[in-house]
Amino acid sequence: MERRLVNSTSQSKTESAQQDAGKAVVLLSGGLDSATCVAIARDQGFEVHAISFRYGQRHDGELDRAAKQASLMGVVSHRVIDIDLAQLGGSALVDSSIAVPKSDHVDKIAGDIPVTYVPARNTIFLSYALAVAETLGSRDIFIGVNALDYSGYPDCRPEFIDAFQTMARLATKAGVEDEHSLTIHTPLLHWTKAEIIQRGIELGVDYSQTLSCYDPQGSSDEMRPCGQCDACLLRAKGFAENEIADPAIG
């Protein structure tokens, strides 16, 4: 599914974008990090083509937020790609029989690989992004992975991103013809959640229209965060450190 969004006001480049940087494919989940990534790509002058995934996630209300962010930020196109990772299982995010870990404080988040890790998810998502980028003639992919807040996820590490970029340059027509043809941008990789939020606010991201929760309650378009999963706790910590209220919680 693809929607082309036309909004001359929201598509205007920010003052800091000095020139048209070309097309960029941005992974947009509907969460806080990916929305910030879209804003950063636009601020750098890229023509943003967003992609989202309906992969059997229990928090599929994030896709409603992704559509809203795509519209608010004036992306040129927004694709929603269907992949049924629930067939494979192995994660609390796609298997309702596995409980999402809950806690009352961010310091209690476990340091090992959590059950919310979806096997090979970022490898799969980036592979689709790579195919879309090559089809569009784009040299740039943005993904909002973060190695500080999500250190337990193996596919959020800089080593993984570097390895995938090397693979992409070997496995594509564009890469064979120009070994430096593709760059995977990870602008949030070494930022704290507070720093991500601060930058997003500077760029005008509407965080009221984002959903970070792994186990939200309610219908898809009205899902409310649980407030106790790892994602909720880290998000709350980020807003608290900025001394502002989370606009998504009212």
From Swiss-Prot:
* Cited InterPro entries: QueC (IPR018317), Rossmann-like_a/b/a_fold (IPR014729)
Summarize where ATP binds, as residue positions: 28-38
Which positions are annotated as binding Zn(2+)? 213, 226, 229, 232
User: What Gene3D superfamilies is this protein classified in?
Assistant: HUPs
One GO term of the biological process aspect: queuosine biosynthetic process
User: What binding details are noted for the cofactor?
Assistant: Binds 1 zinc ion per subunit.
Q: Which GO-annotated molecular functions does the record name? A: ATP binding; ligase activity, forming carbon-nitrogen bonds; zinc ion binding
Q: Which cofactor does it need?
A: Zn(2+)
EC class: ligase
- This entry's Enzyme Commission designation comes to 6.3.4.20
Q: Which reaction does it catalyse?
A: 7-carboxy-7-deazaguanine + NH4(+) + ATP = 7-cyano-7-deazaguanine + ADP + phosphate + H2O + H(+)
- Pathway the protein acts in: Purine metabolism; 7-cyano-7-deazaguanine biosynthesis
Query: Which NCBIfam families does this chain map to?
Result: 7-cyano-7-deazaguanine synthase QueC (TIGR00364)
Family stated for the protein in its record: Belongs to the QueC family.
Q: Tell me what this protein is called.
A: 7-cyano-7-deazaguanine synthase
* Source species taxonomy: Bacteria, Pseudomonadati, Planctomycetota, Planctomycetia, Pirellulales
